[in-house]
A protein has these predicted regions:
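Bacterial N-terminal signal peptides that target proteins for export
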Residues: 4-16
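Sec-dependent signal peptide cleavage junction
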Residues: 23-41
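Short, glycine/alanine-rich hydrophobic alpha-helices that insert into or span membranes
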Residues: 13-26
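Exposed low-complexity, polar/acidic, P/S/T/G-rich flexible segments that act as propeptides
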Residues: 152-198
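Active-site-proximal alpha-helical
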Residues: 344-433, 437-443
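Beta/coil-rich, acidic/histidine-enriched accessory regions frequently appended to metallopeptidases
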Residues: 39-53, 401-480
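Beta-strand-enriched, solvent-exposed domains that form extended recognition/catalytic surfaces
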Residues: 37-172
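Catalytic cores of extracellular degradative/oxidative enzymes
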Residues: 192-373, 382-383
Length: 480
């Protein structure tokens, strides 16, 4: 399907096979130890010896953004955002890195970048250490970029890398210009990696591909990061999260050179782009006008598990892709790729089963028609509804997820959507039909399943915009 089929290359396996493994895959090295007294006395001496690196590049105030796994559970997501706070420093294999931690709280540090330094099958090569207050010395047999991770919710922890670590090109939005990036690449031509940090995104790529695709396309990294931050906030909105509510950890875009059979993929902590696929991240024109791949992969990090039922992994996330596409004033993928006629042909069948639709974009039409009919508030409210459900009431099986989705969608729309779902072959059971009827909302009569981006069909009901807000969503399935 045009350029969209390539984005699906082997992503399902990567996304599903690793999600539980990654949640527990941190490696704590025996090479970490705290030396609280004598080495701490030598801190200023050590700093003076590091004359080749400016002190501001060695001292970091690490914000407490919370625990990525806890935030994942709170938002009902399948995958976590990146825990990384970059330093711009690279640790060589087995190089001793000495870090001073101020205050009285522990902090974590990583050596290595997921997917950049190893394939998604080899996350154990990325090493994580818990640092105690005072002087700590760590090392990794594999080496890699150094990152901090402050699990605290709020506040900061001040750290200083006193010895070890090599400077690499590290571009920060609001601090550097395009010329600064050019100078960094000239100064460190053999750097292990180049990193670019926005307010909400982090990019890790090789110097060669940054030169080829970012500088080679005359992209201004300032504008690129701003546009990527914008895409992130568009997806925040779809998820119903304000700037104050949202997980502030970075959406990580990583160049991957270890999995040649793949094209792009997403799994916990990152989205990855194999080889030259990173051009869709580094070239601002491609990111804005042909960025379905990165939008799609970032969407995977947003998917809520309680309504990700059978064969929806590569469908549900495209709500976020379509939303970015629309906000960037690009033509609808569903229209330009001829998906609507295929969907309408399916809808004319007598015996339909939504689960058996093989084309993920045809399946996407059903989800998108709900937004076309009920407006851009529909999915933010649906996300909030699932976040507000007690954990004990979240569905665990595909069938229960599907049935609860039909009930939840009807609650958000304030309309009995059973006719819509039956038309699509989603097959509500008798219990679901009764629960939706008990909500007391008017039964859908408008043929919203015929809606398209250029010709949306609105429901024929009063007060369609009077949708529940905030804590009005708190509810229980018991007795419904």
């Amino acid at each position: 399907m045009g350029n969209n089929s390539k984005h699906k290359t082997r992503k399902i396996l990567a996304a599903t096979a690793t999600v539980t493994m990654l949640a527990t895959g941190m490696i704590f090295s025996s090479d970490v130890f705290a030396e609280q007294k004598e080495q701490q006395k030598n801190l200023s001496t050590s700093l003076q010896k590091e004359k080749s690196v400016k002190s501001e590049n060695r001292t970091f105030t690490v914000p407490g953004k919370g625990d990525v796994e806890v935030l994942k559970e709170q938002e009902r997501k399948s995958m976590a955002f990146s825990p990384y706070e970059p330093t711009g420093l690279y640790a060589k294999p087995n190089e001793q890195i000495t870090i001073n931690v101020e205050g009285n709280q522990d902090i974590q540090v990583y050596i290595g970048t997921y997917s950049y330094d190893a394939s998604w099958r080899e996350d154990s090569k990325i090493k994580s250490f818990t640092l105690k207050p005072g002087i700590n010395t760590i090392q990794s047999p594999n080496g890699g970029m150094i990152y901090f991770y402050n699990k605290q919710q709020g506040g900061t922890i001040r750290t200083t890398i006193t010895t070890g670590g090599t400077t690499t090109p590290f571009f920060e939005l609001g601090k550097h210009t395009k010329q600064d990036l050019i100078n960094m690449l000239d100064q460190y031509p053999n750097a292990h990696a180049v990193e670019l940090k926005g307010e909400r995104v982090l990019i890790t790529a090789s110097p060669a591909r940054v030169k080829k695709y970012l500088l080679g396309s005359n992209t201004d990294p300032v504008q690129l990061l701003k546009k990527m931050d914008e895409a992130t906030r568009i997806q925040d909105k779809v998820a119903g999260l304000s700037e104050e509510q949202v997980d502030k950890h970075y959406v990580h875009y990583v160049e991957e050179n270890h999995s040649p059979d793949y094209y792009m993929y997403a799994t916990s902590y990152r989205t990855a782009y194999v080889g030259d696929a990173i051009q869709y991240v580094l070239d601002i024109n491609k990111f804005v006008t042909d960025g379905w791949g990165p939008w799609h992969e970032a969407g995977h990090l947003r998917q809520q598990s309680p309504w990700k039922f059978y064969n929806m992994t590569e469908v549900q996330n495209n709500i976020y892709s379509l939303s970015v596409e629309k906000a960037f004033n690009q033509p609808s993928n569903l229209e330009k790729s001829g998906i609507y006629p295929k969907a309408f042909q399916y809808l004319e069948q007598v015996n339909k089963n939504y689960d058996e639709i093989s084309d993920v974009f045809v399946k996407l039409v059903m989800l998108w028609q709900l937004q076309l009919a009920y407006g851009e508030d529909f999915y933010p409210k649906l996300h909030q509804l699932y976040r507000d459900m007690p954990s004990s009431e979240l569905p665990q099986t595909d069938e229960n997820k599907k049935q609860l989705f039909m009930i939840s969608a009807s609650k958000v729309a304030k309309q009995n959507l059973i006719p819509f779902f039956e038309k699509w072959g989603l097959r509500p059971n008798n219990d679901t039909i009764q629960k939706v009827a008990a909500l007391g909302y008017p039964v859908l009569t408008a043929e919203i399943w015929k809606g398209t981006d250029s010709n949306p069909i609105k429901p024929d009901m009063p007060n369609v915009n009077n949708i529940l807000e905030g804590n009005q969503f708190a509810w229980s399935l018991k007795g419904i």
